[in-house]
Amino acid sequence: MDLNTQRSKLYAQLQGQLIVSVQAPDGHAMRDTHTLTHVAAACVDGGAPAIRCGGYGGLEDIRSISNRVDVPVFGLTKEGSEGVYITPTRDSVRAVAESGATVVCADATFRPRPDGSTFAELVTVAHDSGILIMADCATPEEVLSAHKAGADFVSTTLAGYTEHREKTVGPDFDCLREARELVPDAFLIGEGRFSNPADVAHGRLIGANAIIVGTAITDPGFITGQFASLLH
């Protein structure tokens, strides 16, 4: 299937939908590929039309989840914890493409990448590998730049996680709204600190084509803490 057909099919499939991020960092009780694969399958059973995964579980998580679920997989690696670390290099993009992901997610901020590449070069590598690419951005300006560079999906994933924008308590709705104004024709995904259905509904209302939720759905520790805090 050529890229244009892939893109059109995914846009139709994901418009107005919830994508679930299934990840766990090193040291987390859920940091086990087998466990996260079952979590991803449960999310699909619950209606998730796509899964975002990989992160510190890397290619092993992507391969395992891609083999288990029959929905598109947005794959990424996390390499380190400072600067650009989400699928940060051309080699990282190629590796995710070869792991079975449908879409590769990569940092599209204006910060320097470890291999000196530009985001536009990552787009080229992804497309040459036969895979679509999602831009993880921190500011509306980065969303615009990534869209111009050829990203198939643009997102607010990193809003509040770089020095260019303060971290909001919940989702950065202003970032999402401003990004929508700058890229009216892009497939814009809201991500980052969406923790309840009201957040998701508001994100859609102000212009997101789809919303990604992770921790609030897939982290039992976070969910338990939300309930426990009401009783203390």
Curated annotation (Swiss-Prot):
GO CC annotation terms, alphabetical: cytosol
Function: Converts N-acetylmannosamine-6-phosphate (ManNAc-6-P) to N-acetylglucosamine-6-phosphate (GlcNAc-6-P).
Protein name stated in the entry: Putative N-acetylmannosamine-6-phosphate 2-epimerase
Gene3D superfamilies: Aldolase class I (3.20.20.70)
Organism the protein comes from: Corynebacterium glutamicum (strain ATCC 13032 / DSM 20300 / JCM 1318 / BCRC 11384 / CCUG 27702 / LMG 3730 / NBRC 12168 / NCIMB 10025 / NRRL B-2784 / 534)
Family stated for the protein in its record: Belongs to the NanE family.
Claim: Isomerase is one of the keywords in the record: yes
InterPro entries recorded: Aldolase_TIM (IPR013785), NanE (IPR007260), RibuloseP-bd_barrel (IPR011060)
A Pfam family annotated for this UniProt entry: NanE
Catalytic activity: an N-acyl-D-glucosamine 6-phosphate = an N-acyl-D-mannosamine 6-phosphate
Listed HAMAP family: ManNAc6P_epimer (MF_01235)
One MF term in the entry's GO annotations: N-acylglucosamine-6-phosphate 2-epimerase activity
Superkingdom of the source species: Bacteria
Top class in the EC scheme: isomerase
Pathway in which the depicted protein is active: Amino-sugar metabolism; N-acetylneuraminate degradation; D-fructose 6-phosphate from N-acetylneuraminate: step 3/5
Keywords: Carbohydrate metabolism, Isomerase
Gene Ontology BP term (one): N-acetylmannosamine catabolic process
Documented EC number(s): 5.1.3.9
UniProt cross-references to CDD domains, sorted A to Z: NanE (cd04729)
